[in-house]
Amino acid sequence: MANTPSAQKAVRKVAARTQVNRARRSRVRTFMRKFDDALAGGDRASAEVAFKNFEPEIMRAVSKGVFHKNAAARKVSRLAKRLKALSV
């Protein structure tokens, strides 16, 4: 338990940031799930739209510190590879 007022405030701030970050991570996962569903359906047009929606969302999360930039780049690269394979 935090004893000093500054430590108590730090605990409150961490809890608030955790909620925001959890929401951002969930939003990114939702966009990723929409992309996966479009791929599973075999619809290239909707998969492209889902990918174009997913990429800026994950990069926005990177800029906010939710994901590491290399982890996000890896996810984007893998999804782009799957999208390209769908068209071949």
From Swiss-Prot:
Gene Ontology MF: a single term: small ribosomal subunit rRNA binding
Keywords from the UniProt entry: Ribonucleoprotein, Ribosomal protein, RNA-binding, rRNA-binding
GO CC aspect terms: small ribosomal subunit
Coiled coil: none
GO terms under biological process: translation
Domain of life, per lineage: Bacteria
InterPro entries with a match to the protein in the record: Ribosomal_bS20, Ribosomal_bS20_sf
Family in the record: Belongs to the bacterial ribosomal protein bS20 family.
Function according to Swiss-Prot or TrEMBL: Binds directly to 16S ribosomal RNA.
Name of this chain's protein: Small ribosomal subunit protein bS20
Gene: rpsT
